[in-house]
Regions:
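C-terminal output helix
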Residues: 114-124
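The feature encodes the CheY-like receiver
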Residues: 23, 65-66, 94
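Active-site beta3 strand of CheY-like receiver
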Residues: 53-59
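Alpha4 helix (beta4-alpha4-beta5 surface) of REC/receiver domains from two-component response regulators
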Residues: 71, 93-108, 121
Length: 128
């Protein structure tokens, strides 16, 4: 499917992660599925880009410099009249963190390492 046609056309995803390898692998996979990808390397940059670019979905790492994924998620939920869809990714195994993310309104919570097909499936479900 071409990037400029079909249901994915114009769908923009903001990746917020401080790990360059993860950003690159996610970006390549999502672009291969026809999505436009924006990148932020820390929580503050992620919030600024989200406010300026109004993405359809945010993929958010939990542990980042300057502002954690939790703080970004909380701010996203408070500042937008229509909540943006958010997938939180983390290497953290703790169930308390997942419960807190769910309390803040995360749409999906995926633990690293994960198969790219699992992430793409979540993206497609949330953007359909």
């Amino acid at each position: 499917m071409a990037k400029d046609s079909g249901p994915k056309a114009g769908k923009r995803i903001l990746l917020v992660d401080d790990d360059a390898e993860i950003i690159e692998s996610l970006r390549l996979a999502l672009e291969a599925h026809g999505y436009t990808v924006l990148v932020a390397r820390d929580g503050n940059q992620g919030l600024a880009l989200s406010e300026r670019e109004n993405p359809d979905l945010v993929i958010l790492d939990m542990m980042m410099p300057k502002r954690s994924g939790f703080l970004v998620l909380e701010k996203l939920r408070r500042s937008r009249p229509v909540p943006v869809r958010v997938i939180m990714i983390t290497a953290n195994e703790g169930s308390r963190h997942k419960a807190y993310a769910e309390m803040l309104g995360v749409d999906d919570y995926i633990r690293k390492p994960f198969g790219m097909d699992k992430l793409v499936e979540s993206v497609e479900r949330l953007l359909s």
